[in-house]
């Protein structure tokens, strides 16, 4: 992957941990969760107020690509600056939630959504490990 995921933890209580093996191949920069089998998955629950999973929290951000069944490196904690996979067109200062594919997106309702990060820079284009074009955004995990 050409894009650095962890920008600066700034001395924040960040941890890079192996919280389990990947359930399927996962790309660096995705918000991740853990399933009932203890496998790491892309955060698949849209964390907006209109869903039953609005209060669910993503575990963190995947630091490096993980092959199916392989150990994962997950950045956990708050106050960490990361480049994460996202939708296009995010605005600096915007509060972001994890969508149903592990990418960050706009918060439609900050009163009920589970805010995961704050956008620090405009969305930029990059490539994933497979060479596909992907959007990234520099964020502060909160």
Predicted regions and their residues:
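Glycine-anchored, exposed beta-strand/edge motif detector
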Residues: 2-142
